Design a protein with these regions (language model features):
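Acidic, glycine-rich active-site loops and adjacent beta-strand->loop/helix elements
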Residues: 1, 47-49, 139-141, 174
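Secreted, periplasmic, or luminal enzymes acting at the cell surface/secretory milieu
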Residues: 2-130, 162, 190-205, 209, ...
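Solvent-exposed residues in well-ordered beta-strands and their adjoining turns
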Residues: 122-124, 138, 171-175
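Short acidic, flexible loop segments centered on an aromatic residue
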Residues: 126-143, 149
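Intrinsically disordered, low-complexity Pro/Gly/Ser/Thr-rich segments with frequent PxxP/GP/PP motifs
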Residues: 143-186
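N-terminal amphipathic, basic-rich helices that act as targeting or association modules
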Residues: 288-341
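Short, intrinsically disordered, charge-balanced linker/junction segments flanking boundaries
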Residues: 362-367
């Protein structure tokens, strides 16, 4: 979306995705002022798709996914890695409104197991609206490397009238800030709160925050959960560190097939395999038995009214609903009347999200 950011003719933009069948109506209400946007980005919008480290190895294997960025997935990468911040055009948690808000952190405290914050939110604009308060933490960089910012909690206000104020309380467990030690740098296979200073940042996006009025100090490492190693990665040779360098990882192998969770299968034998052909005609061999064909409408030999008049109620249902999904592709098609020469036209579901394949035959939907 760098073209939106860089085009001086565009003063504002409204993004609507995953809206489903009511998404268009909701967008109309927002554009006409009947409603007020209050959504926040759940992703980081970088200037170019190549700015995301996952682009280089997206869908390179059907057997495993190599998260090159390791724990620095999404906004954690862009907020931590040197030089990555400049690539962001719309940060995680970002979202505007027709009105404005003021946030004031009035109190922060901790118990033995949790951290609490109270934030006063005031609508300082001219329109009724809602705001999302977000709290992030910065954990100390010790033996276990960590992202510069991590979302800890968030909450949305009620609909606030101009000048109205609401007190929001945010809380999260201290154990949520623990890091997993898989290599035994401190305690193998354990979740650990490393000693040091834990800082908190409160605001309306990962970038639009102010440091909290209180920090948390730990003088000793705290093990929050002790586990044992199972399903250790066998294909991960290295992983990214917070400075952009990589550390090599020890290699493990499945020494006994009975210890493996999955055994290798011949191609095509996996249960639930997506069909190679997504939409097939209901009749491979047929005679039209005097049925009027859709090609005659397309070529002007038959009116559309005459063509539709011959269809039964079942035919009309097939024409409207298309071919049912028989695999796991989660797409639908209109048409599916091969007896009348009407093919299936594949469409994406209304709230279809991002594709999980390297290539796709049907784009997803957004306004």
């Amino acid at each position: 979306l760098s073209w939106v950011k860089n085009d001086d003719r565009i003063s504002s933009a409204l993004l609507g995705w995953q809206g489903g069948m009511e998404g268009g109506l909701a967008m109309a209400e927002l554009l006409t002022g009947k409603g007020n946007p209050s959504g926040k980005l759940a992703d980081t919008f970088a200037a170019d798709v190549n700015d995301y480290p996952s682009t280089a190895n997206f869908h390179e294997s059907f057997d495993y996914v190599n998260y090159t960025e390791d724990i620095y997935v999404g906004y954690r990468y862009f907020e931590t890695l040197p030089g990555a911040q400049e690539k962001v055009i719309y940060p995680f948690g970002y979202g505007l409104s027709y009105t404005t808000f003021d946030l004031d952190t009035t109190a922060m405290w901790e118990t033995e197991s949790a951290v609490f914050a109270e934030v006063q939110v005031t609508n300082t604009g001219d329109f009724a609206g809602k705001e999302v308060v977000q709290i992030y933490y910065e954990a100390p960089q010790g033996f276990l490397k960590k992202p510069a910012r991590q979302l800890a909690a968030f909450a949305k206000t009620r609909l606030l009238q101009p000048g109205e104020t609401q007190q929001i309380r945010l809380s999260f467990a201290k154990a949520d800030m623990a890091s997993y030690d898989d290599l035994g740098k401190i305690q193998k296979s354990a979740y650990i709160l490393e000693k040091g200073t834990y800082k908190f940042y409160i605001g309306t996006s990962v970038r639009d925050t102010e440091e909290g009025i209180q920090a948390m100090e730990l003088t000793e490492n705290v093990i929050t959960k002790q586990l044992t190693a199972h399903l250790v990665p066998t294909s991960l040779k290295e992983r990214m560190l917070s400075d952009g360098s990589f550390e090599e990882l020890p290699q493990s192998a499945c020494n006994d097939m009975n210890e493996c969770v999955f055994e290798k299968m011949e191609p095509g034998t996996e249960e639930g395999l997506t069909p190679a052909v997504r939409s097939c005609a209901r009749g491979a061999l047929f005679d039209n038995y005097g049925r009027k064909q859709f090609i005659d409408v397309a070529e002007g030999r038959l009116s559309l009214d005459d063509f539709m008049a011959q269809l039964s109620d079942d035919d009309l249902l097939h024409l409207l609903g298309g071919q049912p999904n028989v695999g796991v592709s989660n797409t639908f098609g209109f048409g599916n009347l091969p007896d009348y020469g009407v093919p299936s036209i594949m469409t994406a579901d209304g709230p279809a999200g991002l594709r999980i394949s390297g290539e796709c035959s049907m784009n997803t939907t957004a306004w």
